[in-house]
A protein has these predicted regions:
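Acidic/glycine-enriched edge-of-secondary-structure segments
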Residues: 34-37, 183-189, 216-224, 251, ...
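Pre-active-site segment of Zn-dependent metallo-hydrolases
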Residues: 11-13, 23-86, 90-128, 194-201, ...
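Active-site neighborhood of phospho(di)ester-bond hydrolases with catalytic His/Asp-centered motifs
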Residues: 31-33, 60-69, 76, 89-91, ...
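Hard-cation-handling environments
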Residues: 234-386, 401
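Active-site-proximal loop/helix segments of hydrolase catalytic cores
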Residues: 155-160, 168-172, 176, 183-210, ...
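Metallo-beta-lactamase
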Residues: 99-160, 300-342
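Cap/insert and terminal regions of metallo-dependent hydrolase folds
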Residues: 162, 193-285, 374-379, 399-463
Length: 477
């Protein structure tokens, strides 16, 4: 029975997103091809086999990328190695950012051979198809089968999209600008952003969906309001500065780092002259984050109205006087050594966001053992990652393993949920409620069991109270 959806990752967890939509036995579409992280990595397999594409690629007509986070595109090199040569469809900003992410991923997990990397990136760029938002693109148009796709802004990171797929098995040869009422529409949410994500407009719901594949990362909770999270961040900065300590923030290079810089610029801008915060230095110690921040500046045509208003006032939300970047590895080591001895408070942003690697690890090794420092998490911490362990055991004075060694946690540990670039439970429900025609089937993906179960209960109650039946809400597997 078609259409049929097969999940190759990101169904029962929050990493490794990869979904295959089958139109018939010979034609399919792949949505994302992400890397597994944390406990979702199969440690029983050799390292290279964990990433091998274990499904046939011959039927895949295209790969559509919802956004360029590594848990959504990290297996792309292995997909191409498996023989996929079809179009890689993404939004204009994602087309700009994707080669940067893939280059970094290749250097970390595949090879540092420049010639091989350049050859691979050339192949990726040859396959990239840039699809503007809101524009239908015909993927298949043949006798007995017509498929078209459209991207809409998802508000998660710059370039993020949710995907509308119109599938019709009688090939009506309709105009691509018209809706086909007899077609079946499948929507893949990708990662949906919160309504107040800095720099990005809030996502708007689709007109209709017959089947909705919906993320559920925060399906069991509500985020703090933007004003509350900003006040909490400001309070933590003041607390650290009063103690002569540093604020250490593990953050994704793409999206989260830029959101934090945007918020920090505003906090410093509005601070009273002569206040401690006016003298706060902000360090971004991540070459990839620095590259992406520059790309975000270049892609300002995609910013939201608030960001443009600040820019027109002469402010530079992603490039302000108090901001410094650390480039080379030697400079990084010198910075860690200097700051570990310094009493002048600094806010440090470095990857990785779950503290599972990258330069943040050296800062944590140097500073977790001192109570004057603050460690602040602003994003989801997958089970099995050092970030999750620090959050869990830090308040108890426990320890965490970093690079195989135990480090006692004396620093204060905090989490601000409001900085999540993911929609919360209310936002996810509103995404459906604001459709003109609600889905007949909702498949919940990209969430742990607790989050998916809680969201399933909410949707079933919503359908029961609004239209008299539970709806078909499925926990994908």
């Amino acid at each position: 029975m078609y259409p049929k959806i097969e999940h190759h990752g990101g169904a029962q967890g929050v990493t490794g997103s990869c979904h295959q939509l089958w139109f018939d036995s010979e034609h399919s579409l792949l949505v994302d091809c992400g890397l597994f992280q944390g406990q979702e990595v199969d440690d029983s397999l050799p390292a290279l086999e964990r990433l091998t594409i274990d499904f046939p690629t011959e039927t895949i007509q295209a790969l559509i990328v919802t956004h360029v986070h590594i848990d959504h595109i990290g297996r792309l090199p292995y997909l191409l190695a498996a023989g996929f040569r079809g179009p890689i469809i993404c939004s204009p900003p994602s087309a700009h950012l994707l080669p940067l992410v893939i280059e970094d991923a290749l250097k970390i997990g595949f090879t540092r051979n420049k010639s091989l990397i350049e050859r691979f990136l050339k192949q990726v760029k040859q396959q990239l198809v840039v699809l503007p938002y809101k524009q239908w693109h015909s993927l298949i148009d043949q006798k007995g089968l017509a498929v078209k796709v459209r991207l809409q802004r998802a508000g998660h990171i710059l370039g993020s999209a949710y995907i509308e797929v119109d599938f019709n098995d009688v090939s009506p040869q309709d105009s691509l600008t018209d809706d086909v009422t007899e077609s079946k529409r499948i929507v893949f949410s990708g990662d949906l952003g919160a309504p107040w994500t800095p720099l990005l407009p809030a996502p708007r719901s689709p007109y209709r969906a017959d089947i909705l594949v919906l993320e559920s990362t925060y399906g069991d909770r509500l985020h703090q309001h933007r004003r509350e999270r900003s006040q909490q961040l400001e309070h933590l900065i003041e607390q650290a500065m009063a103690c002569g300590g540093h604020i250490i923030i593990p953050a994704f290079s793409i999206g989260r780092t830029q959101e934090l810089l945007y918020e920090l610029e505003h906090i410093i801008h509005r601070a009273e002259p002569g206040s401690m915060i006016k003298s706060l230095e902000v360090i971004v110690d991540s070459p990839l984050a620095a590259k992406f921040t520059q790309s975000y500046r270049e892609l300002k045509d995609w910013w939201d109205k608030e960001a443009w208003r600040r820019y027109r006032q002469g402010r530079h939300p992603l490039s302000f006087d108090e901001l410094y970047t650390v480039d080379g590895h030697d400079e990084h080591l010198q910075t860690v050594d200097y700051l570990s001895r310094s009493q002048r408070s600094t806010l440090i942003i470095a990857a990785s966001g779950m503290a599972s690697g990258g330069r943040i690890v050296n800062y944590l090794k140097a500073m977790l053992g001192e109570s004057r420092h603050q460690v602040l998490f602003t994003g989801y911490q997958a089970k099995g990652t050092p970030g999750a362990d620090i959050l869990r055991y830090g308040p108890q004075g426990g320890w965490v393993k970093l690079d195989g060694e135990k480090y006692t946690i004396q620093a204060s540990v905090h989490q601000i949920s409001g900085y999540s670039a993911h929609a919360d439970q209310k936002d996810l429900i509103n995404f459906v409620k604001r459709m003109r025609y609600w889905p007949q089937e909702i498949r919940l993906v990209h969430g742990d069991d607790q989050a998916r179960e809680a969201l399933k209960d909410q949707f079933e109650q919503l359908y029961r109270e609004s239209i008299g039946f539970d709806g078909q809400v499925i926990l994908a597997n």
